[in-house]
């Protein structure tokens, strides 16, 4: 029995810490965190003009802002999932906005190819040297993201609950410090974009 126990311990010690890490993923749970998220105006990839966040989210029920580096393998894992969720819920008031980091705008365009991105993309930084200077880095520190580059990093905003004026949009928000867990986030989005009010009930008439 002691030999069997020793064999089990050695096997566990030599195994990868998680199957996610072994598969090259950095999945993270959806959690509510204090983030002190601020509004921004950043240059759009398609328009080459400043795009204001408040304008981009008008009329939406839920918005996922995803910060990413186009060269990052974990972002490339998440990108098809983000596009899939956007396609599924966009007609129900869901919006995705991508914020590119640590790569040139030309590199971002090359990543998305001739078809271009399926949702709006804006640029916050264009050099890896900017890593510790970006708002993205600051938000990651507040939410406990200890990864090196923090790509992807996802934050969910509910426009109806955001501050109507001022730079600060919200103190708290739901975030994912890594790749989305598709089933979990799918359910979350579905619950947020579902009708919040039931139709009026007509009383019975005799």
Sequence positions of predicted segments:
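Second-shell loop/turn segments in exported
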Residues: 67-71, 97-98, 174-175
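Conserved segment of the thioredoxin-like fold in thiol-based oxidoreductases
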Residues: 87-134
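Hydrophobic beta-strand anchors of alpha/beta hydrolase catalytic cores
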Residues: 64-65, 96, 154
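A short beta-strand-turn-helix
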Residues: 37-63
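N-terminal targeting signals for export/organelle localization
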Residues: 1-45, 195-198, 202-206
């Amino acid at each position: 029995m002691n030999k069997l126990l020793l064999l089990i311990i050695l096997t566990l010690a030599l195994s990868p810490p998680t199957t996610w890490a072994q598969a090259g993923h950095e999945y993270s749970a959806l959690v509510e965190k204090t983030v002190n998220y601020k509004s921004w105006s950043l240059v759009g990839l398609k328009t080459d003009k400043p795009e204001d966040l408040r304008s981009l989210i008008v009329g939406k029920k839920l918005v996922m802002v995803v910060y990413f580096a186009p060269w990052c393998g974990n972002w490339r894992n998440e990108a098809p999932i983000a596009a899939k969720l956007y396609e599924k819920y966009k007609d129900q008031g869901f919006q995705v906005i991508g914020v590119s980091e640590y790569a040139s705008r030309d590199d971002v365009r090359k990543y998305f190819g001739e078809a271009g991105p399926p949702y709006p993309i804006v640029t916050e930084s264009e050099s890896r040297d900017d890593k510790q200077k970006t708002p993205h880095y600051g938000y990651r520190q507040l939410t406990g993201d200890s990864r090196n580059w923090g790509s992807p990093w996802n934050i969910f905003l509910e426009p109806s609950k955001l501050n109507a004026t001022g730079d600060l949009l919200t103190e708290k928000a739901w975030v994912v410090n890594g790749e989305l867990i598709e089933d979990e986030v799918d359910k979350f989005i579905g619950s947020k974009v579902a009708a919040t009010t039931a139709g009026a009930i007509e009383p019975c008439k005799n």
